Structure formats: structure tokens, C-alpha cells
UniProtKB/Swiss-Prot annotation:
InterPro entries, sorted: RelE/ParE_toxin_dom_sf, YoeB_toxin
Name of the protein: Toxin RelK
One BP term from GO: RNA catabolic process
Organism: Mycobacterium tuberculosis (strain ATCC 25618 / H37Rv)
Quaternary assembly: Forms a toxin-antitoxin complex with RelJ, perhaps RelJ(2)-RelK, in which the toxin is probably inactive. Also interacts with antitoxins RelB and RelF in vitro, in M.smegmatis coexpression with non-cognate antitoxin RelB increases the toxicity of RelK while little change is seen in the RelFK pair.
Enzyme class: hydrolase
Gene of this entry: relK
Length: 85
């Protein structure tokens, strides 16, 4: 299973959700678990990003917010967990 690292902004986003909306924080935790197992398929409609964020992927947290991450063989780095790209 891949290890998970948070960019400082992504960690702040996650802490925001823990304080503001526990249901969304649980959804993010579930998405991260899925990403650890299979970063390119599963819940949240994973899609590769283009342009500046080429090489990153996103999954839907809800209609407004996305979880943006980059997956390697041994680790996953979370870039954002709030707003749209």
C-alpha cells in the first residue's frame, strides 16, 4: 500500500474539513484509502489533469470540491482537498 503525504495546503484543507464538516472529512478519508489501493480507478470519478497540473489526478469530493493528488509506485502526495482545481 502506498504511503500518503500532504502538501501543506492540502493538510490545511483537510484540517478545515475536520473542523467545518465531519461528513466531508470522512469522504476525503475514504477517497484517500481508495487512492492508496488504486490511484487511477474507483470512487470519486478519478480523472487525469492537464495543463499546469499535468501528472496529477483529481477525484470528486462533492459537486464543488476536488481532491487533487499525484501517485507514484510507493507514495501518494495530496495537493489540494478544497475547491476546484
Amino acid at each position: 500500500m502506498r504511503s500518503v503525504n500532504f502538501d501543506p495546503d492540502a493538510w490545511e484543507d483537510f484540517l478545515f474539513w475536520l473542523a467545518a464538516d465531519r461528513k466531508t472529512a470522512r469522504r476525503i478519508t475514504r477517497l484517500i484509502g481508495e487512492i492508496q489501493r488504486d490511484p487511477f480507478s474507483g470512487i470519486g470519478k478519478p480523472e487525469p489533469l492537464q495543463g499546469e497540473l499535468s501528472g496529477y489526478w483529481s477525484r470528486r469530493i462533492d459537486d464543488e470540491h476536488r481532491l487533487v493528488y499525484r501517485a507514484g509506485d510507493d507514495e501518494v502526495t495530496m495537493l489540494k482537498a478544497r475547491y476546484h482545481y
